[in-house]
């Protein structure tokens, strides 16, 4: 969205969870920590999420739900909300991308884009 009042930036850090993975059974677990930064000028509440999780074979799982980890945080301008969650995929490499549906205090509904990010077992990519 180009309107500077509704500027939400999303950053992601991922981590492979070796202890929760079972490669022989095509189970690869990852944790991710997301920071949702309100760089706009109005308060915005994160209402819901939409994820597209793609494994290395191109299979896509779509996930929708209210809030994030049971919360619908209200994020003040200049503030951020950070949370951690996880995903399990059936290949050593995959991607996640999506959006958060936001509701600004002035009544405007808008989407905050989550750019694609990689899930990868260490050493799986050269």
Curated annotation (Swiss-Prot):
Residues 2-126 form the ApaG domain. GO terms for biological process: error-free translesion synthesis. Pfam families: DUF525. HAMAP family: ApaG. This is Protein ApaG. It comes from Pseudomonas entomophila (strain L48). The gene is apaG.
């Amino acid at each position: 969205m180009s309107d500077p009042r509704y500027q939400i930036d999303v950053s992601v850090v991922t981590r492979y969870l070796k202890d929760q993975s079972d490669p022989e059974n095509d189970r690869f677990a990852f944790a991710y920590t997301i920071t949702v930064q309100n760089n706009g000028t109005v308060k915005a509440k994160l209402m819901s999420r939409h994820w597209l999780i793609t494994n290395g074979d191109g299979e896509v799982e779509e996930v929708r739900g209210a809030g994030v980890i049971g919360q619908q945080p209200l994020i003040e301008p200049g503030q951020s909300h950070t949370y951690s969650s996880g995903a399990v995929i059936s290949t050593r490499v995959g991607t996640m991308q999506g959006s958060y549906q936001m509701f600004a205090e002035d009544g405007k509904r808008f989407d905050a884009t989550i750019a694609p990010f990689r899930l990868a077992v260490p050493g799986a990519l050269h």
